[in-house]
């Protein structure tokens, strides 16, 4: 029996789409706390990730049934600052002095666009497994 998200496999209160289960939470948390919360809800749980515009549309409709705010955390971040950075002269980046501020991505449902902001910002969120 697969627990990958058919309608019968989703926990009570969760919604199924394309083999995954989703649940919006009307709780304000920073990105790290929201991600931690999602991992505690179900094995394999995380903040929502989008593989298509159809999936995003499904989640936005689901989210609006739970909260009025137009933004919510999704599982994309640059917490570890591990982008493939390279100097303009093609030298490898060996010395790093990143500011402590890291950026996480939230979904702005009024225009279905992604935006980055401090990971310390408080927002609602959607979990997925």
UniProtKB/Swiss-Prot annotation:
It comes from the Eukaryota. One of its GO terms (molecular function) is toxin activity. Its main location: secreted. Disulfide bonds join 10-21, 38-127, 104-119. Expressed by the venom gland. Residues 17-128 form the C-type lectin domain. It holds the Pfam family Lectin_C. The keyword Disulfide bond applies. It is found in: Secreted. InterPro entries: C-type_lectin-like, C-type_lectin-like/link_sf, C-type_lectin/snaclec_domain, C-type_lectin_CS, CTDL_fold. Transmembrane segments: none annotated. Anticoagulant protein which binds to the gamma-carboxyglutamic acid-domain regions of factors IX (F9) and factor X (F10) in the presence of calcium with a 1 to 1 stoichiometry. Belongs to the snaclec family. This is Snaclec coagulation factor IX/factor X-binding protein subunit B3.
């Amino acid at each position: 029996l697969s627990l990958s998200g058919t309608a019968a496999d989703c926990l009570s209160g969760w919604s199924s789409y394309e083999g995954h289960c989703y649940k919006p939470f009307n709780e304000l948390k920073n990105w790290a706390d929201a991600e931690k919360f999602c991992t505690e809800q179900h094995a394999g749980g995380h903040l929502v990730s989008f593989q298509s515009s159809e999936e995003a549309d499904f989640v936005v409709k689901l989210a609006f049934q739970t909260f009025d705010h137009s933004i919510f955390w999704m599982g994309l971040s640059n917490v570890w600052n591990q982008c493939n950075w390279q100097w303009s002269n093609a030298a490898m980046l060996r010395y790093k002095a990143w500011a402590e501020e890291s950026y996480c991505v939230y979904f702005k449902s009024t225009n279905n666009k992604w935006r980055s902001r401090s990971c310390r910002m408080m927002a609602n969120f959607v979990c997925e497994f």
